A protein has these predicted regions:
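Charge-dense, helix-prone N-terminal extensions
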Residues: 1-119
Length: 119
């Protein structure tokens, strides 16, 4: 069972992801993930110590080069342009919102991505 802190982080992440158009939450590999059009745009483990998402290629390089304690290449999907971000007491949730939104726009159908980008 997740701790109170993990549930709080997971709730914040869930709120960010599910505000995006047509986003859904599913459980795969015993962990929550968020999808649009059946494609994953963000995922995390139940302990909510990190979130993994697709990143803009240039932004991914910048993130990975900026703080190795905070950003990392995730297993399995790192080679496909995804980045992991550690979630802890100093997490910048506005940044997480921006990164999740970017991931969503990279994964979502163009009409949904355009709607989010123009909002």
């Amino acid at each position: 069972m997740a701790s109170i802190v993990a549930r709080s982080r997971l709730d914040r992440l869930r709120a960010i992801c599910l505000t995006l158009p047509e986003a859904t939450e599913e459980r795969t590999w015993e962990s929550p993930n968020w999808r649009v059009n059946h494609r994953i745009f963000a995922m995390c483990h139940e302990d909510a110590t990190s979130v993994t998402m697709k990143a803009d290629p240039d932004e991914r390089v910048a993130l990975l080069g900026s703080d190795a304690d905070r950003y990392f290449v995730p297993a399995y999907v790192g080679s496909k342009g995804w980045v992991g971000v550690v979630l802890n007491s100093s997490t910048d949730w506005d940044e997480i919102r921006e990164l999740v939104t970017t991931s969503y726009c990279l994964i979502a159908p163009k009409r949904l991505a355009r709607a989010v980008q123009s909002a």
